[in-house]
């Protein structure tokens, strides 16, 4: 059994967290294929949207995972999650599901409340995450109010500086939301601090993505 992890952000903290969550869910016997191309996210950040060349390279990574024998693929980056949506027909045709890391997190946010705060350091992640929350809310027959928490100047800071800015940003919206979504997987290490500080449910994508990856493998009969 092989699971492919497709990264467009290669911070060590993110990779460590994702692999920890994946291993916890699918076990240590699974072979992990790690495919990484940070130039994709860099291009998206610079352009402010997912360019056709960035999308093409990401789709190429999916196909490389298939060529390497992956049984399921986890798309790590929320900024390019809509690319994963666009190739679901192809994924079904080759029999290799492509799982978005943030899809079920967004569904859980809608289940937990009508007012959803979205924290992000990149506008290119904030907007796709909001779009996903709105889409799944419609599919669930619910309406949600989205509260932006774009944190300027936080991208690239060390963990302690980032933690401080994130706590400040969450504090500004805490009275206006029922649940907070961390739009980037690399934010996950601040989840406990935010919950303890403000008593609001805080969701991060690697945990949900790993669970969905497990379900995809179970549906193929590869896991009990």
Label each residue range with its predicted role:
Residues 1-224:
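Non-catalytic structural scaffold of enzyme domains
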């Amino acid at each position: 059994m092989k699971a492919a992890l497709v990264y467009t952000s290669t911070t060590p903290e993110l990779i460590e967290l994702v692999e920890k969550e994946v291993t916890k869910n699918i076990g240590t016997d699974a072979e992990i294929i790690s495919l990484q191309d940070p130039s994709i996210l860099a291009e998206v950040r610079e352009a402010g949207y997912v360019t056709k060349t960035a999308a093409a390279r990401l789709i190429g990574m999916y196909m490389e995972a298939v060529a390497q024998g992956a049984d399921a693929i986890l798309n790590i980056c929320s900024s390019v999650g809509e690319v994963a949506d666009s190739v679901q027909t192809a994924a079904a045709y080759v029999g290799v599901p492509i799982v978005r890391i943030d899809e079920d997190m967004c569904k859980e946010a809608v289940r937990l409340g009508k007012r959803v705060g979205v924290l992000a350091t990149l506008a290119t992640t904030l907007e796709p995450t909001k779009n996903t929350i709105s889409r799944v809310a419609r599919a669930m027959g619910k309406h949600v109010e989205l509260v932006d928490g774009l944190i300027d100047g936080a991208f690239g800071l060390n963990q302690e500086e980032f933690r401080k800015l994130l706590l400040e940003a969450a504090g500004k919206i805490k009275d206006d939301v029922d649940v907070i979504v961390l739009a980037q997987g690399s934010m996950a290490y601040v989840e406990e601090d935010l919950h303890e500080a403000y008593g609001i449910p805080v969701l991060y994508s690697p945990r949900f993505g790993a669970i969905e990856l497990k379900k995809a493998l179970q549906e193929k009969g590869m896991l009990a």
